[in-house]
Amino acid sequence: MAIENIYIARHGYRSNWLPKGPYPPPPTGIDNDVPLSEHGVEQAHELANYISKLDVKPEMIFSSPFYRCLETSKPTVEALKIPLYVDRGVGEWYKPDRPIIPEPATHEVMSKFFPSMISPDWEPSIIPSNKGETEEDIFERCHKFWPVFIDRVERKFPNVKTIMIVTHAATKSALGMNLLKFSSAKEPIDNKGTFIRNGSCAIDKFELVKGENESIPFEEREWKLTMNGNTSFLTNGEEMNWTFMNAFEAGSDADIKARRAAESGKLKME
């Protein structure tokens, strides 16, 4: 049986995005492995509540190994009582010129923070370079990820039709654009100049075009985007949207500084 529905969500609002703190240290001690803010935790619960009311619900979640993604996944895992697997293939994007390229915590470490939540029997579909990635590299990573990942899911869980991935803005965008068979994450998805939306806790849905099945190689299957960066269920709507048109890594200190400077300039003009 082929996977027919794929939800892809971004993690919730990070604690280091708050204008005045508090800024708790990374629970794992790993650089940039920050937790969600209280607001982000609330978003994660709103996401879980939204998903639990959908007609087509995910049957399992595959998460980035970074703390904020597991924290975002937790309410949905608990609400739907579905298994959670960690896959480094959907991990964060770090540029090569970054001083430190964070290595995510091991399963043993993360299980201490999320006891009995993370299923141990899943190996990464692909491992991001420990030297960082260019925009072209992360797009290629996601391109290589899909056929390996889907083949393993369909073999290991032959009765599963719907899955969910919880990841980061850049990875979410690159994953989606690869499903839609674009050659770059910077291309609009239609002639109106629309891009995949990547706000905090935003969720996309990709549906397999009818008539496709597991007998067709994954690379030849066609997908359609039926939900683009949906945040209608969030109290504050869309926040912290990011695309590859931004100059900085999503959610990085440089990104936050640039956003605040732009907002300050806007307020002065008003």
Swiss-Prot record:
SUPFAM superfamilies named in the record: Phosphoglycerate mutase-like
GO annotations of cellular component type: cytoplasm; nucleus
A Pfam family recorded for this sequence: His_Phos_1
Molecular function terms from GO: phosphatase activity
InterPro entries tied to this protein: His_Pase_superF_clade-1 (IPR013078), His_PPase_superfam (IPR029033), Phosphatase_SH3-domain (IPR051710), Tfc7/tau55 (IPR014623)
Highest taxon listed in the record's lineage: Eukaryota
CDD domains: HP_PGM_like
Assigned protein family: To yeast YOR110w.
PANTHER family recorded: TRANSCRIPTION FACTOR TAU 55 KDA SUBUNIT (PTHR16469:SF51), UBIQUITIN-ASSOCIATED AND SH3 DOMAIN-CONTAINING BA-RELATED (PTHR16469)
Leftover remarks: Present with 1950 molecules/cell in log phase SD medium.
Name the UniProt record assigns to this protein: Uncharacterized protein YNL108C
Organism expressing this protein natively: Saccharomyces cerevisiae (strain ATCC 204508 / S288c) (Baker's yeast)
Highest classification ranks of the organism: Eukaryota, Fungi, Dikarya, Ascomycota, Saccharomycotina
